[in-house]
């Protein structure tokens, strides 16, 4: 037992468990659904056991529940029913689910969500942080000797900077946990002790692809080869062509394992809004201003959103870079000539605004520059964790000068004090108060490091100081809440769930049902939020609000006005509005809805639900089809006030005979990857299904595959011959089929690859 309790692995585990104490001891869930019930209607109308409503800790992390949690829940629900999660029919009138990439559909840890609601998510988030800590602990075993150094480096990697602020989103920390393991395997291949490192590298690369964080995947694809060749030169004195070829083959098979995810995502990326929206450029590509550098060691210098005193124009969440108050003094006092020193300064150089970084991130580089440059702080975190561990290791060995450590610490303390005087008077008190914490902790660290000679006492104090600092940073930012807050029912959601499907909903305001949250109730909407959704649908969506088709696109599809005919054609039967007399929160759509013939059918406190009595069925026939030669002409047709999408259609392509008679839709059986429609077609007609078009959909008329048309820019259409009885739409994307074949082939190739390595070693 004594040996067990003295194990650094046990201490590392206990530290992480203590940081997650609200979940471990009280079952509170690491998911910010306090924001759901405390800031959004219809939940806001209820107190949920509180006197004045649920207090909201951190609204900046709302994407964790409104996107990532509901996506994971949908994936598990589909798998539970034996349906492969290819398609999400609940947002954007339908959108790819697997191909969206950050849904991480195939990540094995998703299976934890089969556990009871809330508990499974808590385990999922907790294990991600544990995995990050343990992977760094394993990797540091090849670089440092002291157990305390390994524990501290592991804590820095698992808890510093974006590892804390992105913790509850469920993808980034899992992806980051794999990077040290990949580097560890590369080291193992160079040392040549065991062949297992090659297939393990293959497996980890595939797992990284499935983890669902494209930036970390891209960064790994850059730094892993650089690290591999650097370590070869350092260890072997040269680049070994045979070894390099073996590793390249292992990595190639790993990419093949992930092909079932990569190919659909790359295919979808080419048709998405990602390269067209100006989100990243609007925020200067996510580059940090040099004044934000102080947040590397004083996270709350500009305040904190949790305490509602953050006053910087740079988002606390997006630009999170905190390494811990002790890390930079350690790095400066002992800066080795190593790969991680170069990585540390290169990542900082690219993360902060300068002509070179601005030029690089302004380039159209898919998977890299279409997202925020601040994501590179994950690499800063990695390098800092290794460098800090090396510095502490050398501190114990007497190679890190304690005097230099003292002066470097005093330097950062002086910079902090000077910076306070440059803060405007209104906010200076915040910076002064918050900095006092960091300066006090830094003083304790410097005094301990300089004057305590006993190795055991110093090790214990340093571990405690780092644990307290980084644990406080994590606990302050991330909410742990009651499971009862996870998408509870309200009269409004209950009313909508009781209506006969299929139908879609929309809202007049983002304070009504946060984007995508309706997925948790299995309600379908024309709206949605996603950095990766169809560009064609984004343009079409403008017409629902009465805006021009060619307007710019963004990751938000939010109703801004009423275009009744287009909403009806999209099967929008219910629209939620605010029901209040307060001028600042008064409904701006209610009067227009009444004018267009919508009827108020349900009211609960601050929310009124309007219904369209003339809404079109999910599938309907039109008697007139127009033809456009390109998207520009199609856009002009859709913008034409005389165009009526409930009675006619416009498609791109060669004209065909469109003299259609009367037809009837008898029944619709709407499933996730398949839609079956029974029709009565006397003379032949043109059938529209108002689900979003995607090239992966196929259509079968009485069992025979036929042409699927993209209708009105975003919906699906098909010519129905006379005497037809059954129409079936199936989602069968070719990219998924090809990817699956490559993945299975790579899986089969892995043991053959290992066998080949074994035979080569015996020769």
Positions of PLM-derived features:
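Short aromatic/hydrophobic helix-turn
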Residues: 152-164, 200-207, 257
